[in-house]
Structures are given as C-alpha cells and as structure tokens.
Amino acid sequence: IRNSSYQTIKGLELKKFIDQLDYLKKNYNIISIEEITNSLMHKTKLQKRSCLLTFDDGYKDHHKYVMPELMKRNISGCFFPSAENIINNNVTETNKIHFILDQQKNSDLIIKDINNFLISKNFKIPNKKKIYENFEKKFIKRYDSKKIKYIKFLLQSWIPDPLKGDCCTFLFDKYLKVNEKEFSKKLYLSPKEIQEMINNGMTIGGHGYRHLRLGDLSYKNQLKEINLMLNFLKKFNIKKKWIMCYPYGSFNNNTKKILNKKDCLFAFSATP
C-alpha cells in the first residue's frame, strides 16, 4: 500500500500481516474449516484458544501474499470472494467507495457530486437532518469522520438500487479515470487463482454475488443473489457442505431459511 497509487486505502502492509500471523501461530491453535465442521456435526469441543483465519472479498493479494505465508506455516484459511466482480470484471460498490475516498479527499465535493447526480436523475433529496439521524443509528460504531460516514451511508444504504450503483460508477469514473475492467483484473482473484488456492488446501466459500446487504433485501431478491453465488461456487466443484460469510455481516431470518434449504453448513457474520 505504501508504494501504491492508493496510499490511504485501509489495508495491512505485508510485514504487519506476517507479524500478526506469527503471533496467532504462537499464541493460538489455528484450526481448519474441517475441524469446525466436525465439532458442529459431532457436538465435540474445540481445543482452547482455537482460531480460524478468514479473508473476505477475493482480493488478488490473497493469492499473491496470504496463501504463500499460510503454506509456509502449514496452516489453511477460508476465503470468501464475491462472485460478480470475478465473473464480469467489475468493481464492487464497496471498493468503488474506498477508492473514491482515497482519490478525492474533499468530502464536501463528493457530497455535492452525489447530490448533483441524484438531481440529474430526478431523485428528490430529503431533509439532510433526517438522513443524519438515520445514518447515526446505523453507522454509530464506525471510526470514520461524520462526513465520511454520511457518504458511505448514502452510497451503501440510503440511495436505492440500481441508482446507488450508477452513482458509485459515476464517481469512480470521475475521480479515478481508469478502465474498470482492467482495474478489476488487478484487484481481484481470477478463476485460475481460486482453483490454485483450492488445490493448495485453502477453503473457498460464498460471499454473495453482488456483495449486497442480504438483510436489506426481500426474500425473492436474497434467493436470486444466493442462487447466482452458488452457480459461481459450482464452477469450482463446490456443491455440498459449502459455507458462507455474509457481506457486511448482514442477514435476517429469510437468509437463514434460504441457506438451510440450500444445504449450507454454516455462515459467518461480523455481528453475533
């Protein structure tokens, strides 16, 4: 990150990752997904201080840097790529927001551009105070500044689909001035790299198709999102005993019903 063109992206330098890995290896019992599966199926206890390594979003760095370090230590990890950006070589809305904020430090200008975009689409902007009240409740635990939280709330939650995707693309094109497909190929894993990771003992799970907040979707739209994700996993012969990590940690009872019907072993969330 330090030597890249995007130096304010929130990521971890390789040296710090190696230090963290060595700390975990020394102080915890790093386990595999098979050990968790056996524990759940046979109702046996895991060893004390057990630790499972998981990596979301399917970044190319996971193949280039993470996998080799895990293999050096004879440990495995679980990787959860989102499907659409790998299939269609686009950039997820979440990552577009990260790079927009990296390239344009003036939050007021971003907010102005968002408002102008919405106006151009004849989308009425409600009272700003009401928006602030809503996002404060939802994003209160974020460490970003108030304006950054506001921007993320607008682009991730408040603006409806498909308008929010169009808005993210508009801002991404304006501030980064790059070819999205080529940018995506450099950012995310390729199918070949995913297969190499599987061949080297890594576990691949589902992370949605478009990386949407499942808990905000209707049953019908969740089912569509999960079916598309499963079609992606089948390309790697992942058909049974599959696992999932919820994008944003978001899910509801409908999500759990669908996963049960689809024979999902279990799913991970960022929230209890």
Where are these regions (language model features)?
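Catalytic alpha-helical scaffold of carbohydrate-active enzymes acting on polysaccharides/glycoconjugates
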Residues: 1-243, 248-272
